[in-house]
Amino acid sequence: MADQYHEPVSELTGKDRDFVRALNSLKEEIEAVAWYHQRVVTTKDETVRKILEHNRDEEMEHAAMLLEWLRRNMPGWDEALRTYLFTDKPITEIEEETSGGSENTGGDLGIRKL
């Protein structure tokens, strides 16, 4: 457990440790998506493929839940996600356009526009 911290645990608040837990879990979920996806695209058995697709998609849901928790709780995530998600703008040009900020999307992340 100590290897997940780069600073003394005693100097971290409970909330900071929750951030570490969520971030580590997010990394694990993303890794699981990658593993399942590789299995999906290489299996020859259709039934196995469908099961693995289901498992991969479940991991995506878990990752999305963790991102939402981070957005609501850890400073910086809300602004970053509002800036870069749910837009058709070229990803590499968004930061230049916003100068590090983001426009007000009315609290829906622009989803209603989809």
Swiss-Prot record:
Spans annotated as Cargo-loading peptide: 86-114
Name under which the protein is recorded: Ferritin-like protein
Segments of skewed composition (Gly residues): 103-114
UniProt: Fe cation 1 binding residues: 29, 59, 62
Organism placement in taxonomy: Bacteria, Thermotogati, Thermotogota, Thermotogae, Thermotogales
GO cellular component, one term: encapsulin nanocompartment
Pfam families: EncFtn-like (PF22277)
Keyword Iron set for record: yes
